[in-house]
Regions:
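Short flexible/disordered coil segments
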Residues: 98, 129-130, 184-199, 254-255, ...
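Short secondary-structure transition/capping segments
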Residues: 82-85, 140-143, 164-178, 263-267, ...
Length: 346
């Protein structure tokens, strides 16, 4: 019988000394054992280096390697550096303040191996947890938020409600085997955070081409948009990880007021526009390669969808990304620090 392929993991860290050990340990506990794992510290000024070295020494796991950067590269740069250490057809990126549940890799890899259609990206739902690993919400409301029933009055199935151990307080959720194939990107849709995703490595190598200084954050939004445009995506309808909201996140705040709440600590629309325009530029600049790989029709549809979302690109010139940024967003993406390639895009 055929064997499952190995999976690569990059844990990119910046200033998360309080949580990075839990992230590393969650990868070590994965039921799939054929892993290559790289922990990248993105020049953290806190005690992250000490925490990472202590954790790796305690584990004594030969699958783990450690790279400490002397200069902060941001999220894209740190992830690229980590990927240079990997030789796997699939890759995942775990934010160092989040944690995976034990079957995260197994569930994603099984869905990627489906006998229906191969995609570049699978992503899953998440629990929202606090700094002490306590669950604040049983789902990320934005996960697959374009589904028709998202805003409908409805009965919530008992299978979506956990049992609570009265002695320990431990929550147990029933297993949810549901998966959904999304054949095309939609501006109304959403996936989930970086830690929810498993990518085909060849796809990441193909499209993660913007210079690192232009993509210091929001690599998840960039890659998931590209995956939806070029290959389609598959959603796994079970929370397979804990997305931690602790008050010091690069993007999110620490509150869950309920409803379709805004989890960001800054305005989303300028960020969304910036990243989509970056996708649009790469569709143009890498057109020959993308057409050869995915076909003329798929590329043309992607260009049209981006034009509908953010407008047409200027004809005959490529304006520098920073020149189009409002001052607030320039500060965020130009100087922001990562939580968290074969080509040198620094």
């Amino acid at each position: 019988m055929p064997l499952a392929p190995p999976v690569g993991v990059v844990i990119a860290n910046h200033n998360n000394c309080a949580f990075v050990e839990k992230a590393i340990e969650s990868v070590a506990r994965q039921t799939v054992r054929d892993l290559q794992v790289v922990v990248v510290d993105d020049a953290s000024p806190d005690r992250s280096d000490e925490a990472i070295r202590r954790c790796l020494a305690r584990l004594g796991d030969a699958r783990f390697r450690y790279v400490k950067l002397g200069t902060n590269l941001g999220q894209a740069g740190a992830l690229r550096r980590g990927m240079t250490e990997l030789d796997t057809p699939f890759v995942c990126f775990l934010d160092s303040d989040d944690l995976w549940y034990d079957d995260f890799v197994a569930r994603h890899l099984a869905v990627h191996m489906n006998a229906d259609f191969p995609v570049a990206l699978t992503y899953c739902d998440s629990h929202i947890i606090d700094a002490d690993d306590r669950i604040l919400a049983g789902t990320a409301w934005w996960f697959d938020s374009d589904k028709p029933q998202a805003k409908a009055r409805r009965t919530i199935a008992p299978a979506l409600t956990p049992t609570i151990d009265p002695a320990s307080g431990e929550l147990t959720y029933p297993r949810n085997d549901g998966v959904t194939f999304h054949p095309q990107w939609s501006p109304a849709g959403a996936t989930n955070t970086t830690a929810s995703m498993m990518f085909r490595r060849a796809f990441v190598d193909l499209v993660l081409v913007p210079p690192s200084h232009e993509l210091r954050l929001y690599v998840d939004f960039y890659l998931s948009t590209f995956a939806g445009l070029m290959t389609g995506t598959i959603a796994i309808h079970e929370a397979l990880y804990g997305y931690r909201m602790h008050g010091g996140n690069s993007h999110s705040n620490a509150t869950v007021p309920g409803g379709a709440y805004n989890s960001a600590n800054r305005e989303w629309e300028p960020i969304r526009s910036y990243v989509l325009k970056m996708v649009q530029r790469v569709l143009r600049d890498e057109a020959e390669t993308l057409r050869l790989t995915f076909g003329e029709e798929r590329h043309s549809i992607a260009e049209r969808l981006m034009a509908d979302a953010v407008g047409e690109l200027p004809i005959g010139r490529a304006a520098p990304a920073k020149a189009r940024l409002p001052e607030l967003l320039l500060g965020l993406l130009g100087d922001g620090l990562s939580r968290l390639g074969p080509r040198d895009r620094s």
